[in-house]
């Protein structure tokens, strides 16, 4: 029973979190091991269109159709989505690394964008998939907010998505490209 006092020392009173601090650099490294698609979140407020590269995006519910985006509280996009009450999610195609870099704060000289509006929300015309969502709820999540959006509009083409893994862009390879690998149905 000697381990019980040591275990108690590791946890803060009233918390399930270990008392030690998590190194933010290491946290980012570990989280980057999860391969994910790259999106540009768009919104318009007071006549100004904003876009921000993000990979904190997920489907939230099928019934009703909801999606979730994670936005840093200090980001200009946080204020823009809050004011607009809606947002666009633009899933980038595998060839759109330059678009990702541009909206991540590394502008690409000469890069031009065409926006289309659906349900009052700007979307990148050349994204491989686009969603418009009306903000249904906002939840605090540490230094971020989770915006839950009710899907109003969605469209997609057949191009493969841009993927990021270990802080690098990656290519998508389908499992059924390997002989004998069965298809997987999640829905």
Predicted regions and their residues:
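Basic, polyanion-binding surface patches
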Residues: 2-187
